[in-house]
Amino acid sequence: MSSFEGQMAEYPTISIDRFDRENLRARAYFLSHCHKDHMKGLRAPTLKRRLECSLKVYLYCSPVTKELLLTSPKYRFWKKRIISIEIETPTQISLVDEASGEKEEIVVTLLPAGHCPGSVMFLFQGNNGTVLYTGDFRLAQGEAARMELLHSGGRVKDIQSVYLDTTFCDPRFYQIPSREECLSGVLELVRSWITRSPYHVVWLNCKAAYGYEYLFTNLSEELGVQVHVNKLDMFRNMPEILHHLTTDRNTQIHACRHPKAEEYFQWSKLPCGITSRNRIPLHIISIKPSTMWFGERSRKTNVIVRTGESSYRACFSFHSSYSEIKDFLSYLCPVNAYPNVIPVGTTMDKVVEILKPLCRSSQSTEPKYKPLGKLKRARTVHRDSEEEDDYLFDDPLPIPLRHKVPYPETFHPEVFSMTAVSEKQPEKLRQTPGCCRAECMQSSRFTNFVDCEESNSESEEEVGIPASLQGDLGSVLHLQKADGDVPQWEVFFKRNDEITDESLENFPSSTVAGGSQSPKLFSDSDGESTHISSQNSSQSTHITEQGSQGWDSQSDTVLLSSQERNSGDITSLDKADYRPTIKENIPASLMEQNVICPKDTYSDLKSRDKDVTIVPSTGEPTTLSSETHIPEEKSLLNLSTNADSQSSSDFEVPSTPEAELPKREHLQYLYEKLATGESIAVKKRKCSLLDT
């Protein structure tokens, strides 16, 4: 039973399937089909007076509905005010207010509803959006997708509201057998009964005057027997139905209706009062098409159920089932959905709760725009949920990893310096374990690993660590050993240099006491190697402005000529003025080779000796080893503590007493380089992290 009041919120000046109360002021009327619950007030005296006072009010319906309506004398006063619209034909209608002359243009399209002969749905399009009124309808799943006029440009039209037939919008009626299934069951029962004898008769107990024509026409066509009905006037202009119906009572299939049909049935008489010939009693069975009765069953039943000695129920419906309603609405996906019928045993609020999730209003009404992103790369994304259009596009592609290049000018971490001191200054090594641990973590965390051109020797000797450093450095070296994420240089490079016992007799090793896992930092050369240790050295050291940043940041290297390499001298200074000293004695045969040294190593061109002493920046755990063995002349590494040199300037390094001026033949290679136009320069480093 329809509960629709007749007016839509989008177009309140028209009335549909309701013709009383506020609807009397409508500018136009629409009738979906000829069932009494949709015709309230259609023949009321008040509406007749309205038509008499108006010249531009009309009733719009389908051609079949017009024929069915005008067959009744009660509705013949509408004859001059009914306009039929062909199905699936968009028609423009002008809604005129006769008092003010205001005019509104709308386009109306009639769509088949599948409810009964002539039943249609109304699709309204105008300034207030697109609205669909279904009336009573029965559409199977997927039929909405086959209606072209519900689509535009290959997609469903943007529908603002749907006024929906919700007669069976109840989970109890989740699935209703199709009309074809019901017809198959009824056809089998009727055939098995009427073929027994001419006195076996079937009565189709149908409540409504329209809607069961589908059964009548198909039974008559399959069995070759016409169906008896009370009147044929309504089908006079429908020959496809009229051919299968008759008013002759002498037939085996009846669909006649009588106000006291049940009484006639109790006395074994048909509503039409037909009796048998030759006083032979008739054998009559009744088949009542219904849907509500099946919805109240707690167990699944067949399409045809026997309810008495001669009575049957057939599950036949011309309203959409619960699943068909959801399929229809979810396909259209309107902004709003309003129920036209309150199902038996439920409330309007429950129906609205069912319809609301199927509408766009339950989601965001604003369209979601997403960039297409980078289409050159495909990416598989695993979803935890299956949520509509939020996962249509892939997430933005990740930024490619960048190489770890140090930027000392932008990042200045706090470094806990620890310098090696002489026996006269043991208090400088008395740092707390917390400071040492922080220094180790800082150095290992911010150390970047760059390519090194030098290969380490395959045979690495282990030397002892002084007892004065074991207590303070034990925790630091043990912590570094536990850090398995820091790679060792031995994994990437091999040692090719030979180590002499004389060169290591005065040098301690950090690998014996603590087993440090920190990377070994060193300067590289084509013919020699110089290894450095800061934590294990017993000297008092300091970093100059030019050499303070090299061992922390692992930055660029510069080429030194053979003259600079032979005259390199790095003197050890105190903590306030630290400068490493390099003393080399290289034969002239090797002076033609360039030495690749770290950028932060400061070479004194005025000093030259057989001993080489290199001390790196503080806070950088390294390994001390000997230089590569040279066949012509061995260069030994000896540790020399020179406390007097602590007063040297950052810009001028005085020559040591043992230094000699470079000989002329030593400078020959340098002059050749200058003659060819090749530039030889020692680049200066920027301010170190430790200088801050």
Swiss-Prot record:
Effect of residue 548 to A: Reduced IR induced phosphorylation
Classification via CDD domains: artemis-SNM1C-like_MBL-fold
Assembly mode: Interacts with LIG4; the interaction is direct. Interacts with ATM. Interacts with BRCA1. Interacts with PRKDC. Interacts with TP53BP1. Also exhibits ATM- and phosphorylation-dependent interaction with the MRN complex, composed of MRE11, RAD50, and NBN.
Record-linked Pfam families: DRMBL (PF07522)
Biological process annotations from GO: adaptive immune response; B cell differentiation; double-strand break repair via nonhomologous end joining; interstrand cross-link repair; response to ionizing radiation; telomere maintenance; V(D)J recombination
InterPro entries tied to this protein: DRMBL (IPR011084), RibonucZ/Hydroxyglut_hydro (IPR036866)
Task of the protein: Nuclease involved in DNA non-homologous end joining (NHEJ); required for double-strand break repair and V(D)J recombination. Required for V(D)J recombination, the process by which exons encoding the antigen-binding domains of immunoglobulins and T-cell receptor proteins are assembled from individual V, (D), and J gene segments. V(D)J recombination is initiated by the lymphoid specific RAG endonuclease complex, which generates site specific DNA double strand breaks (DSBs). These DSBs present two types of DNA end structures: hairpin sealed coding ends and phosphorylated blunt signal ends.
Protein name: Protein artemis
Effect of residue 38 to A: Reduces PRKDC-dependent endonuclease activity, although V(D)J recombination is largely normal
Impact noted for substituting residue 562 to A: Reduced IR induced phosphorylation
Sequence similarity: Belongs to the DNA repair metallo-beta-lactamase (DRMBL) family.
Consequence of substituting residue 35 to A: Abolishes PRKDC-dependent endonuclease activity and V(D)J recombination
UniProt keyword terms in alphabetical order: Adaptive immunity, Disease variant, DNA damage, DNA recombination, DNA repair, Endonuclease, Exonuclease, Hydrolase, Immunity, Magnesium, Nuclease, Nucleus, Phosphoprotein, SCID
GO cellular component labels: Golgi apparatus; nonhomologous end joining complex; nucleoplasm
